[in-house]
Amino acid sequence: MKNEIIERFTSYVKVDTQSDENNENCPSTPGQLTLANMLADELKSIGMTDITVDDNGYVMATLPANTDKDVPTVGFLAHVDTATDFTGKNVNPQIIESYDGHDIVLNDKLNVVLSPEQFPELSRYKGQTLITTDGTTLLGADNKAGIAEIMTAMAYLIKHPDIKHGTIRVAFTPDEEIGRGPHKFDVGRFNAAFAYTIDGGPLGELQYESFNAAAAKLTCYGKSVHPGTAKNKMVNASKIAMEFHHALPKEEAPEYTEGYEGFYHLLSMNGDVSEAALSYIIRDFDRDRFAERKEYMQKTADALAAKYGNESIKLELRDQYYNMREKIEPVKEIVDVAYQAMKNLDIDPIIEPIRGGTDGSQLSYMGLPTPNIFTGGQNFHGKYEYISVDHMEKAVNVIVEIARLFEERA
């Protein structure tokens, strides 16, 4: 199975599918549709049915039930796009057989080294087969590992009809990394009782809590005057923006928070004297605290507007997704089945909140409860990203075992 996983995964990552938040089309980049069509062809070749690719790049397919039992339809999802944080063009995956536990030189010329000194968890993978970058791009394990694992699991079930299962639906979605993955996802057409995203990190991750999330854009408007004659006339938009940012709690930022702690995160800033813009994301697990964070931003903007004039400040707040725990807890069995599947395979489940979001965060509020399961990857969204093929194989086995357990329990 390892070679099958490697072949699939390395072919997927070579397609540039980086999404683009500045493009309102769906998918936001043509490479995503290219990969979607490739995946549809592969689904057909392994024996899946009801395969569709719509104009928005959503791939769906069915593995029909091979049992007479009344088993709820389960879905498995992964997203085709890669993050905007680092380039995903010309990905050149490197395969490290029987990792020796020492430094991995990703790129000698650029002196890019994946070291257990900097990334201590790397030592846990000694003896395993790793796939890394060449030091110039991200890898794309987020989330092409999930695609490879779902595809391999479906191929395995088709080749092993002795493993009984209910109807399984598969979907590969666009634009998850820019928060739009489920926006045009047809839950009714997908027609599953519940689903799992295969979009987590290290072995054993099982997640059914996510952030509540919002985006904020602050635009400041100033008055540009020649600096030689600016006294009592100039209003510097960039300084207003700086004042706003410094009013936010310094310790409530990603680099200072963990676990269930929320944050304000400055994504980008640009400007001059006349106009300046700050883009933020707001995150918190608690719904009330989430509301308080948005209110604090609004009050800060209002105070600056009172100081510099109402025309000097514009704050736009937009909710992105909510903590999916609220929708999953009423059907907690789906978490319990995934937990048992891992235990059956001698995998220690790690139940922890997602300090981020998945398609499941939004899908759960669209009527499709969707927890998240590990892929086996580490250091997503950058040149130090890597994944264990051994753990990818375990993810495949978990998918198969989940399908088997639901049939057994029916």
Swiss-Prot record:
Name of the protein described by the UniProt record: Peptidase T
Intrachain disulfide bonds: none
Reactions catalysed: Release of the N-terminal residue from a tripeptide
This protein's encoding gene: pepT
NCBIfam families per UniProt: peptidase-T (TIGR01882), PRK05469.1 (NF003976), PRK13381.1 (NF009920)
Keyword Iron-sulfur: no
DNA-binding in keyword set: no
This enzyme's EC code(s): 3.4.11.4
Gene Ontology cellular component list: cytosol
Stated family: Belongs to the peptidase M20B family.
Subcellular location field: Cytoplasm
SUPFAM superfamilies (UniProt xref): Bacterial exopeptidase dimerisation domain, Zn-dependent exopeptidases
Molecular functions per Gene Ontology: metallopeptidase activity; tripeptide aminopeptidase activity; zinc ion binding
Binding annotation for Zn(2+) 2: 142, 177, 381
The record's free-text note on cofactor binding: Binds 2 Zn(2+) ions per subunit.
Entry annotation: catalytic residues: 81, 176
Single GO biological process annotation from the record: peptide catabolic process
Cited Pfam families: M20_dimer (PF07687), Peptidase_M20 (PF01546)
Keywords, sorted A to Z: Aminopeptidase, Cytoplasm, Hydrolase, Metal-binding, Metalloprotease, Protease, Zinc
Signal peptide limits: none
Organism of derivation: Bacillus velezensis (strain DSM 23117 / BGSC 10A6 / LMG 26770 / FZB42)
Functional description taken from the UniProt entry: Cleaves the N-terminal amino acid of tripeptides.
Cofactor: Zn(2+)
Ligand binding (Zn(2+) 1): 79, 142, 199
